[in-house]
């Protein structure tokens, strides 16, 4: 017994020693930290950088140690730096009065032929926004992503004029990338890898498959850049599907690529260091971009480290303060509620919808019944072939009949020379791809997948007949199999169907509101097509076909909005970033272009609401002439930060002016957003909005309200009169509830109309009679 106790004691002592050593190592190990100092105090960037080195040298003891520690100096749009610091060093520097905050480096992830005709921007129409703005010429779209493939035809500069005089950026040479690879279309390319390298010490730059330059290995950056501002490329298709002339939203706008995302084989994908992203933002501000398109997402914000503690949002605040419109992806974590990211009120956050385009794939059963599934199958027609449904696959005494994920559990079941039907509840394409691989390996000739219809992405390679149907159609096929002695099936090539009767939906993966941290700030703001978008890519992309690929995600919807903003910027160069947001939100489609309701995919399909698509689907032509705008400036953002409880000192350093928040603190409901979201209405609340006339000088607008269910909405005044002396007018909105219990959100709208313009903002109201109550039922 004594020996046993001695052994246990030795084990415990060893464990304590290991834990102490681990703790000591974590205290002394240097990791990248971002030191944020707020608005820069000096206009000379060299002076700003020198002040950063001096601050670091005073902490570390020598200039050499400071130089070795420094990763980046942020010196153009704002002041700060990234440096390798221990925890104790980070704490010491955070205590300095001139430091707003210090946080460890984080990471972000990566989140077309028919698109523009669908949105009413046909190049064949001489009288539309596209041609009124010379297709966005002189507007510069900055893209922060995985880089660019400069040889892609989407970046040809045929017919493009001289580089805009305001451009102060450049084209940085590197691995397989020359400064001469830029042209009048692709006017800038830079790369930022120091933060990534500091956090991935084992990364070998000489053996990496990625290019240590602005050249794109992954293809994602090339894809999104070409969606936003790609040039005209005729006769493009994806193996014969989705054919037509390919172009970006603003085909004569200029592209500047800032590569801050890197392929890492050990991580099996692409990752983006926040310190690299911050440097990309800093450089983009300096270079003179007009629009920043960022198809990157961080974690769903479920803690307090947001906004002023979120370096990504902080950097973008400085971009917006300099007049740059920032467009970001809302994320691909839908359809669950409160999954939307990039939620700061100065960011334009984008949801994804389908197009009015599909790829029906005829499945003909032996009884001559034709079922139209969905696929991107471009191989030869599969003639009449035996059709089977695997019965009684077993594992640990459980039966998995016909489950796609269990096809490998019954290797004795013959699939050779047959088409297999299976069912799945999986929302991942990886599981279906594995099922297809097993069927192919077993000698099968095709696969029909019955799955929840919300999961729209193509699950298989295009050279293998792999067709998706919903559960109802899958059950019809199964009934045929079980009622026929020798069931057979024929599968034809996929076709392209555009326009009616294909409806538009908010796609299942698109992240949803409400805003998890600031529920009174509506997110997402707007929606755009983001499913199976055909655009340029890198030759290394596994989905590459002739330099192009069809990809899906809010990553793809984001540059659609960026392209539209570029056109609007060319038309209204004097507008603020908030004005552009207001214009596209208040004029958005709340039905699809054919007047049909827009549904949202999820566990059950429902009519879309503002938490699915914000204001609706972007309507570029209407956004060009919105009539009224809900404008915002620094004071509105200060009001937001004060209402969120940030202290005067932090806000002052962020905005570069002395700020004293009122006591009591202001209401976030008064932030001049083109939406009204009330998350906790108990009795009655009154809020204020201000609209600015950007239409005819002498205008009269009258209000109409579609109130949320059980909610009274009173607007004062009911009529707004504008003239040469009265450009902006404020109004109040009194909202009260008739509900006697806590409710979910109900939705409505508030519209100002002058018989020409309809300026619509969404209303979202939740009654909370019992405040601060978590309802687990």
Swiss-Prot record:
Enzyme class per UniProt: hydrolase
Residue ranges of every copy of the Peptidase S8 domain listed in the record: 115-624
Free-text disruption phenotype from the record: No visible phenotype under normal growth conditions, but mutant plants have enhanced disease susceptibility to the pathogens P.syringae DC3000 and Hyaloperonospora arabidopsidis.
A Gene Ontology cellular-component term: plant-type cell wall
EC code(s) of this entry: 3.4.21.-
Glycosylation, residue list: 131, 204, 235, 397, 412, 508, 540, 647
GO MF term list: serine-type endopeptidase activity
Pfam family, one: Inhibitor_I9
Active site: 145 (charge relay system), 220 (charge relay system), 555 (charge relay system)
Keyword set, alphabetical order: Extracellular matrix, Glycoprotein, Hydrolase, Plant defense, Protease, Secreted, Serine protease, Signal, Zymogen
Ranges where the Inhibitor I9 domain occurs: 32-109
Residue ranges occupied by any PA domain in the UniProt entry: 403-481
Keyword Zinc-finger: no
GO biological process: induced systemic resistance; proteolysis
InterPro entries: Peptidase_S8/S53_dom (IPR000209), Peptidase_S8/S53_dom_sf (IPR036852), Peptidase_S8_His-AS (IPR022398), Peptidase_S8_Ser-AS (IPR023828), Peptidase_S8_subtilisin-rel (IPR015500), Peptidases_S8_3 (IPR034197), S8pro/Inhibitor_I9 (IPR010259), S8pro/Inhibitor_I9_sf (IPR037045)
PROSITE patterns: SUBTILASE, SUBTILASE_HIS, SUBTILASE_SER
Main localization of the protein described in the UniProt heading: secreted
Classification via Gene3D superfamilies: 2.60.40.2310, 3.50.30.30, Peptidase S8 propeptide/proteinase inhibitor I9, Peptidase S8/S53 domain
Note: Plants over-expressing SBT3.3 show enhanced disease resistance and enhanced activation of MPK3, MPK4, MPK6, MPK11 and OXI1.
Reported function: Serine protease that plays a role in the control of the establishment of immune priming and systemic induced resistance.
Protein name: Subtilisin-like protease SBT3.3
